């Protein structure tokens, strides 16, 4: 009986000691009002060295970048650059972001550019970055080949047969270029996208015998015939 009583008292005593130690550890190791301070002070900051744009496959893309110590935040813009001379903002331009990621809407067959600039921190006397980090991003299928301006398209594919591929192939015509096609182009069982430039369509002139043949699907985009 006494042994059981002693063991129970001992157990309660140990539990109390552990609880006190845990509480003390929490109060010493954490202060909910404390703030973390960077060691980077009185510095000219640089923009992030690594910017990643990831397609979420749901009509959006996430822009991520590495932390720049001593920063007071980041200035982020995302542009449609189908026409590089007339960048179109997607979402808020020069958005202030207190973090390392942001999400934007995206569309098919579009070229984009993400810009991330580090902002200064007055408390640490750190100066903002002079230039933004830039990252190109596209929702275009990767180009398999680009057909030179002035080429007969049928002759091009005779000289450059389609590779064996289980994935869709994409062939580009040069923006504003002119082309001819005077014979049959047979893509067989390969899925192909045949495209020009969204802003400055190339033009293809068909001869009497010209036609495309496919049994796997052909997408023709941004080309005038």
Give a label for each model feature.
Residues 2-14:
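Bacterial N-terminal signal peptides that target proteins for export
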Residues 27-70, 123-141:
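Pro/Thr/Ser/Gly-rich low-complexity, intrinsically disordered linker/stalk tracts
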Residues 139-180:
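Acidic Gly/Asp/Thr-rich repetitive segments characteristic of extracellular carbohydrate-active
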Residues 180-193, 203-225:
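Extracellular beta-strand-rich solenoid/capping regions of secreted or surface-exposed proteins
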């Amino acid at each position: 009986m006494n042994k059981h009583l002693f063991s129970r008292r001992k157990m309660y005593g140990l539990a109390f000691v552990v609880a006190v130690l845990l509480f003390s550890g929490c109060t010493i190791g954490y202060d909910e009002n404390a703030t973390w301070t960077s060691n980077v002070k009185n510095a000219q900051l640089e923009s992030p060295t690594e910017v990643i744009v990831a397609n979420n496959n749901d009509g959006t893309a996430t822009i991520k970048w590495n932390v720049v110590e001593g920063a007071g935040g980041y200035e982020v813009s995302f542009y449609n650059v189908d026409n590089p001379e007339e960048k179109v903002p997607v979402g808020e331009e020069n958005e202030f972001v207190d973090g390392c990621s942001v999400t934007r809407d995206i569309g098919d067959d579009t070229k984009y550019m993400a810009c991330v600039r580090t902002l200064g921190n007055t408390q640490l006397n750190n100066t903002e970055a002079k230039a933004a980090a830039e990252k190109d991003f596209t929702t275009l299928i990767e180009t398999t080949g680009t057909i030179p301006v002035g080429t007969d398209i049928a002759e091009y594919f005779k000289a450059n047969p389609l590779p064996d591929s289980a994935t869709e192939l994409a062939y580009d015509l040069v923006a504003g270029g002119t082309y001819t096609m005077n014979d049959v182009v047979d893509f067989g069982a390969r899925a192909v996208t045949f495209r020009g430039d969204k802003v400055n369509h190339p033009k293809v002139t068909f001869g009497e015998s010209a036609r495309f043949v496919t049994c796997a699907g052909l997408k023709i985009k941004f080309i005038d015939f």
